[in-house]
Amino acid sequence: MQKQRHFDMARFFQALADRTRLRLLNLMRGEICVCYLVEVLGEPQPKISRHLAYLRGAGLVAARREGKWMHYRLAAPQDAGAAAILRQTLRTLEQDKAMQADRARLERVCCAPQLVELQGAPVPGKRIVSS
């Protein structure tokens, strides 16, 4: 039986109070490899990983490993009020010009065959099954 975690409202709002973390949440419209987040945001991988760990700790992001790649996706908060706030935050981010630019960069990055071929990175939102 899995132990249910206590919802920490302060940590939830602290997670949303950082521009880099908001940018990360904005890019998660399905599962995405950390390599794409690094490429789109133009930040060092350790910084991105630190912010993703904070989002995981706040219950906003879930992760899974596939080979050497970490894949992240949004996780709905257990608290109904927090879930509603997150949904509204994501809708608001969609209207922000800088966030729209991030999404456009993601589309270019993930759809560039040379980048995928060179890095061997999986396409965001698509699960690759190993044989």
Regions found by a protein language model. Name each.
Residues 41, 52, 103:
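Short amphipathic alpha-helical/adjacent loop interface patches that line ligand
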Residues 57-66, 73-75:
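Beta-hairpin "wing" of winged helix-turn-helix
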Residues 39, 50, 56-57:
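Alpha-helical residues within the helix-turn-helix
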Residues 1-5, 32, 36, 77-131:
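C-terminal regulatory/oligomerization modules of transcriptional regulators
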Residues 1, 45, 63-66:
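Generic N-terminal leader/processing signal
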Residues 7-47, 69-78:
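N-terminal helix-turn-helix DNA-binding core of bacterial DNA-binding proteins
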Residues 14, 23-26, 56, 62, ...:
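A cross-family signal for key residues in well-ordered alpha-helices
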